[in-house]
Amino acid sequence: MTNWLETRACAPAYGGWILMGIAICFFGAGINTMAGWLYVISGVSFALLGLAVILPPRSLLGLVVKRLPIEPVTAGDDLTVELEIFNQARQPTSLLQVQDMLPFVLGKPIQKSIERISHGKSYRWVYHQPTERRGIFRWQTVELGTGAPLGLFWCRRLRDAAVMAVVYPKVLPLTTCPLIDEMGDEDSQRGDPRGRPLQTATQGLTRCLRPYHIGDPIRLIHWRTSARYGELRVRELEVITGGQEIIIAIDSAGNWNEENFEQAVIAAASLYFYAHRQQTQVALWTASTGIIRGKRVVQEALAAIAFQEDGTTKPPHSPLIWLTQNPLTLSSLPNGSRWVLWQDVSTEQEQVIVNKDYPGIQIDTEQSLQTQLQKCIR
């Protein structure tokens, strides 16, 4: 009842109930004794109560809330939330309480008390909200509340201020990753009659030498030629693996344990950005998006991804790195693929059948994910 009154009219505060009781008592005493001064006291009390009912809602009428866009962050960092409250009324507003109605998965509503906003002025409120997990979070409203000027009645009103906050998954700082580095070694071994594998797409073969440009990887500098010419020369690479790109695919249409799936998303983000740092052509596949490329697009897709997605796209038939919890899917991987397998906690260890045709990693949730992604594949 109190909530209904506060959001649609006004609800008495503790002081309001006390004054209301006193006014009724004086009015009753005046009826019994016919004393004029009792009527005066009760009349003044009722007048104050009437003002206390009218003024709080009126003080909120001229307030407009605008919200600034929220910059994306990585899980574990703080969201920076900024709101501006404009006072368009002809008189100042005082003793205001502002509450940002966050979604419950992000945190509890955040409150701020504002002493005064002058006529035609604005108040900027900036706060930082911690994040723990990735996701795309949306919320719509900001709640304004006041009991000014008398504090006898309290009212609250909602203002529309829709916003979206994007929290990217964590990216592990991988220093090496055999899943990426050794991708394509089997194919290049079969294609070389001398038994020496060709370079992978991350390395290639030297086509020609050119002057060094700022931003070129140091590993591409040809030191002998640079010493001969007296300037840095860089190898231009001819990619040998037929232009293959590495596709990191998450089995998002399958059933997952929630914690395993969150680890898989972190692994996908870490593998993607490791390959990107190695200047390898890389893409991400999910059941809902299909194949996507580009840092921002991939980050947003991984922020929004969920398991048991209703996707119509099938995994590509080219070699890929398959992240899954279902070992039965490993038997249908394309040639040259790799896999990363999480075990369902409800499945006993001896019941898990792993496909040994392709190398991969079986994740132990008790160990560091970063360490396991950096170890040699089997």
Regions found by a protein language model. Give the residues of each.
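An amphipathic, basic-hydrophobic helix/alpha-beta surface used to engage anionic
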Residues: 47-293
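Intrinsic disorder/low-complexity segments enriched in polar/charged and small flexible residues
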Residues: 6, 19, 127, 141, ...
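Short, exposed beta-strand "edge-strand" segments with a Pro/Gly-rich flavor and a Y/T-containing core
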Residues: 4-11, 223, 291-293, 359
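Acidic, low-complexity intrinsically disordered regions
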Residues: 13, 33, 121, 135, ...
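Short, structured coil/loop segments at alpha-helix boundaries
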Residues: 13, 31, 35, 103-104, ...
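Acidic, glycine-rich A-domain
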Residues: 259, 273-378
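Extracellular/lumenal glycan-associated context and N-glycosylation machinery
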Residues: 1-66
